[in-house]
Curated annotation (Swiss-Prot):
It comes from the Eukaryota. The keyword Secreted applies. It is found in: Secreted. The lineage of its organism: Eukaryota, Metazoa, Ecdysozoa, Arthropoda, Hexapoda. Belongs to the FARP (FMRFamide related peptide) family. This is FMRFamide-14. GO terms for cellular component: extracellular region. Keywords: Amidation, Neuropeptide, Secreted. It comes from Lucilia cuprina. Detected in the thoracic perisympathetic organs in larvae, and the dorsal ganglionic sheath in adults (at protein level). The modification Phenylalanine amide is found at F9. GO terms for biological process: neuropeptide signaling pathway.
């Protein structure tokens, strides 16, 4: 889940 957060870039 946290790793998907970086995709918010």
């Amino acid at each position: 889940a946290g790793q998907d957060n970086f995709m918010r870039f």
